Curated annotation (Swiss-Prot):
Species annotation: Ipomoea purpurea (Common morning glory)
Protein name, per record: Large ribosomal subunit protein uL2c
Major localization class: plastid
Disulfide pattern: none
InterPro entries for the chain: NA-bd_OB-fold, Rib_uL2_dom2, Ribosomal_uL2, Ribosomal_uL2_bac/org-type, Ribosomal_uL2_C, Ribosomal_uL2_CS, Ribosomal_uL2_dom3, Ribosomal_uL2_RNA-bd_dom
Keyword terms, alphabetized: Chloroplast, Plastid, Ribonucleoprotein, Ribosomal protein
Residue ranges of the region described as Disordered: 224-274
Gene: rpl2
GO terms for MF: rRNA binding; structural constituent of ribosome; transferase activity
GO cellular component, one term: chloroplast
Subcellular location: Plastid, Chloroplast
Oligomeric form and interacting partners: Part of the 50S ribosomal subunit.
């Protein structure tokens, strides 16, 4: 990812950055409209997820997370921007005439060939079962359930590592630091997801944040007591509690939100560190 700067005309161009390399195109039968449902409200119009709403209209790009075109070579035709995720996507033309979008692997360029199957080389962008990969392989787009498609390590810059294989399971270290077991027959894609420097991008102004569907975040200490436990007081007052809390009164710092008796607990060897 190449971060470009604007010439300074206004405060927003002074502070904002842009990536001018990647554009968006419209592939036939791969892009379609979707119902706008990301406003953070339930059926009664009550806010259930704060700080969401608005944003620019989006067309959904159908991404191939399953990589089920087995043993058919494909060629990367374009590298495109996708408004629905922070990673870039690639348009692949397969030898049988099929066209698919996949997540852009870091280091892959236009013209590269990729393939998925059981007996393919360990090359960036290739997809194959974990049982066929050597230990230490960097992977992304990892399946949890066989045939369901990749569900882990799909964000921009995400990369996991295959650290062990024993019996019917493989041990994976995820980007969060979690170490868990996955069936060896599940597939994954070799390499790291592209657009690694997405966290270095500066939006430059509040309006750019609103285009993304993000609404302002207000501190609880400046609210009224009816709206937040930190609110109230005369002038600039402290929160009035020993520790910060959420708007619903739960501890805000360090509280674990994962259910203790979740079904997947038996597959986790070490919990996340991030």
């Amino acid at each position: 990812m190449v971060i470009q700067l604007y010439k300074t005309y206004t405060p927003s161009t002074r502070n904002g950055t842009v990536n001018g390399q990647v554009k968006s195109t419209r592939g036939k039968n791969l892009i379609y409209g979707q119902h706008r449902c990301g406003k953070g409200r339930n059926a009664r119009g009550i806010i259930t997820a704060r700080h969401r709403g608005g944003g620019h209209k989006r067309l959904y790009r159908k991404i191939d997370f399953r990589r089920n075109e087995k043993d058919i070579y494909g060629r990367i035709v374009t590298i495109e921007y996708d408004p629905n995720r922070n990673a870039y996507i690639c348009l692949i033309h397969y030898g049988n005439g099929e066209k698919r979008y996949i997540l852009h692997p870091r280091g892959a360029i236009i013209g590269d060939s990729i393939v998925s199957g059981t007996e393919v080389s360990i090359k960036i962008g290739n997809a194959l079962p974990l049982t066929e990969m050597p230990l230490g392989t960097a992977i992304h787009n990892i399946e949890i359930t066989l045939g369901k498609g990749g569900q882990l390590a799909r964000a921009a810059g995400a990369v996991a590592k295959l650290i062990a294989k024993e019996g019917k399971s493989a041990t994976i270290k995820l980007p969060s630091g979690e170490v868990r077991l996955i069936s060896k027959n599940c597939s994954a894609t070799v390499g790291q997801v592209g657009n690694v420097g997405v966290n270095q991008k500066s939006l430059g102004r509040a309006g750019a944040k609103r285009w993304l569907g993000k609404r302002p975040v207000v501190r609880g200490v400046v609210m009224n007591p009816v709206d937040h436990p930190h609110g109230g007081g005369e002038g600039r007052a402290p929160i009035g509690r020993k520790k910060p809390t959420t708007p619903w009164g739960y501890p805000a710092l360090g509280r674990k939100s994962r259910k203790r008796n979740k079904y997947s607990e038996k597959f986790i060897l070490r919990h996340r560190s991030k």
